[in-house]
Amino acid sequence: MFAIFTKIKDRVEAFLNEKNIVTDCLNKIEEKTGIKKRYLAYGAAGVTGAFLLLGYGASLICNLIGFVYPAYFSIKAIESPGKEDDTQWLTYWVIYGFFSVGEFFSDIFLHWFPFYYVCKCLFLLWCMAPVSWNGSQVLYRHVVRPFFLKHEAAVDGMVSNISVKAMSAAENVTREVLHTLVRNRTVGPAESEPRSLPSSAHTEPTVD
């Protein structure tokens, strides 16, 4: 447990030494206040934890933690020449996707669970932790991968059938739309019958 906190601390220190929008803001605050950006970051983390405990904006904070940080490092992984970090973050997004779907269907019950957002935040931090046994790796190796390999053929067949049906439906809709447009253009608007104009001749009254 101590090793994971040490690695997280090293990752945070490396992040604070990089040049990005977060460190630029921290550097400006450090220049004005004289407080080191390391302590500013730790203070922000403490305030975030307090909001999670109190429940104010906890859902938004959890989503930002689970998305913004991994998205940033996923972009860096895409731009890097190596592929090891690509696999790491792809694994995280697979677990994040499954977790989000499960949370959607059980949110009405989990909303009343005490300190749910604190537990969710800790779970997401565990999934993105910079260690080989983080949550995404453990869950993928022991849950997702065995299930996928066991049902891969069935899943591929189902996806193929859905794709074929979707393409067929799209072709039918396109064909019907084109047929309707061609028919309307061929028939054209119906011609209205000519209306007779009133006679301009004035009839003189007859005198008996």
From Swiss-Prot:
Residues 187-208 are annotated as: Disordered. Disruption phenotype: Morpholino knockdown causes abnormal retinal lamination in the developing eye. Residues 197-208 have a biased composition (Polar residues). The chain crosses the membrane at residues 49-69, 93-113, 115-135. Its main location: endoplasmic reticulum. It comes from the Eukaryota. GO terms for cellular component: clathrin-coated vesicle membrane; endoplasmic reticulum membrane. One of its GO terms (biological process) is embryonic retina morphogenesis in camera-type eye. It is found in: Endoplasmic reticulum membrane; Cytoplasmic vesicle, Clathrin-coated vesicle membrane. The keyword Transmembrane applies. It holds the Pfam family TB2_DP1_HVA22. Keywords: Cytoplasmic vesicle, Developmental protein, Endoplasmic reticulum, Membrane, Transmembrane, Transmembrane helix. It is a multi-pass membrane protein. Required correct function and survival of retinal photoreceptors. Required for retinal development. In rod photoreceptors, facilitates stability and/or trafficking of guanylate cyclases and is required to maintain endoplasmic reticulum and mitochondrial homeostasis. May play a role in clathrin-coated intracellular vesicle trafficking of proteins from the endoplasmic reticulum to the retinal rod plasma membrane. Belongs to the DP1 family. This is Receptor expression-enhancing protein 6. It comes from Danio rerio.
